[in-house]
Amino acid sequence: SRIILHSRSTASRWGLGLGVDNLGSAGTGRDRNAISLSLDSPLELNDSLNLSFSDTLNHGPRYSRSNSLFYSIPYGYWTYSLFASHAEYRSPFTLSSATFYNSGRTDQVSVRTDRVLWRDQGHQLSANLQLAYKDVDSYLQKVRLGIQSPTLTVAEAGVNLFWLNSAVWNLDVNYAQGLTWFGADRDADHVQKNLPQAQFHKYRANLTQWRNGQWLGQPWQWQSQLSAQYSPDTLPAIEQLLGTDDSAVRGYRDNSASGAIGAVWRNTLRLPLNSDLAVKITPRLGLDNGWVKREHGAQSQRLSAASAGLNLSWKNVQLDVDYQHNLNTPAGFAQEPDVWLTRLSLQL
């Protein structure tokens, strides 16, 4: 008898992603590059490490840069994670033929624990606790803007429910409260009472659905996401719900809307085409709606937009093109042109 040994190939523990896109803002530069690095089980404990870096390509007087680290480690029904990030920007604007600069930075560190409470074949219920420290500095020329430069310590508690039926569902419900720990700003020190509050209370919910099917032999994939937020307090900008963004209501790039109270509903329909081509072709359509209010008593803003896109995938390369058109212009918004967005990515 003979014993024959064959080597088993295993997937690489490392992952490297490279990308370029034009998703940046007009003030800091549209064109950006991005690098992401991932490592599975660096301590051989089923843990994971992810690093990401992004920068604008113009390298002139305007820029936007960010980097982040995420590490997680499971232990039975528990998962512990650490997140840290740094971002900075510089944006010029002109008044009476003179050029001035807005600039700033944001540093964040958070620790989080998740615990699975119950699960069966089609459901999983978990709870989470998080403590985050956020430090923001904003400047006009070299003058620090105190109201726009909060230092916050935020505690959060939430529950997550994941379940399967004819679709895949995920529900997150979360409560956040600002604390006075670690040198955070104190509301008691404010002379004015209408300033953004560091010791705020905030409620958030997020419901996501993924559904697949076929129509006349054509497969389709529908993703729908509803995000809502409520706070009785005036919130710092970093804690507000953002209504205008490529991850919120698409189609608004020159104007922005955010607030303590609001909701965003995003819908994307994908139609993967059946073909013998080496390139996978997936057209898509999108329809988004949003509603935000900066604070109690403020005027609300309603947002809506439609989009059409195309994803081309070949081996480890993806090209994504998106056309976005806003369907209404809220009060105070300048008229928005239609938007073309492009992303090119390589995964190694």
Question: Which role does the model predict for each range below?
Answer:
Residues L37, V111, L207, L310-V317, ...:
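Outer-membrane beta-barrel "beta-signal"
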Residues S1-S81, R119:
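Outer-membrane beta-barrel initiation region
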Residues L23-G27, S54-G60, A87-S96, G104, ...:
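Sequence/structural signature of outer-membrane beta-barrel proteins
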Residues L18-N22, L49-D55, L82-E88, A127-D135, ...:
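Transmembrane beta-barrel strands of outer-membrane/channel proteins
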Residues Y139-I281, G286, K293-E295, A334, ...:
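C-terminal outer-membrane beta-barrel translocator/porin domains of Gram-negative envelope proteins
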Residues D47-N50, G60-L161:
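Transmembrane beta-barrel wall of Gram-negative outer-membrane proteins
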Residues G29-N33, Y63-N67, R105-V109, H123, ...:
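Residues that define the transmembrane beta-barrel architecture of outer-membrane proteins
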Residues W14-L16, L43-L49, G76-L82, R90, ...:
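Repeated loop/turn-to-beta-strand initiation elements of outer-membrane beta-barrel proteins
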